[in-house]
Amino acid sequence: VSWAIYDPGHGGVDSGAVGPGGTRESDVNLSIAWQAHAATVMAHGESWLTRWADGCLSLANRAAQANYLDNAGAFVSIHCNSNGPDAHGFEVYHFPHSPAGITLATAIRDAVAHEVPALAMRGDRNGLKADGRLAVLRKTKMPAVLVECAFLSNPNEEAWLAKVETQVRLGRTIAGATMAFLAGRS
């Protein structure tokens, strides 16, 4: 059985982005990751979080945790974006030279587009973006993606991301796509 590794971005003194209404990215990321973990376990899958509470971890530590698990099959780093009040949408980053990473990114993008059709897709290829500079994509041994769920800098998306229902929906959708990806590789 392959494990899904969910990495709630930021944490501790590193809150990540903070929306105009005060919503902290690290808190939203952790909640979505917990929802993904719970959905995976409820579906009899195996899951691990790189951080289980509000604490600060280095990027190297996040990748090392995933690489330590022999059966880690997918690494999903969960984030919220920030780039001005008018920026909006969802995107998934993947390592440019990883066909499996591209497949995982596409699965998550497609699932979110289906479950949340009102959420615009951003990136180079309609919600997908290649980036070889991100440490968690570069240093993990398994297929890895970094999900930017929406923009905390946009007041409308911040209000949406702050809702528990949104966090549950995104977590379950990300988990479902990740588990389908893992099932296709076994």
Feature map (PLM): residue ranges:
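Active-site-proximal helix/loop segments of hydrolytic enzymes
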Residues: 2-4, 26-186
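Short glycine-rich His-centered loop
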Residues: 2-22
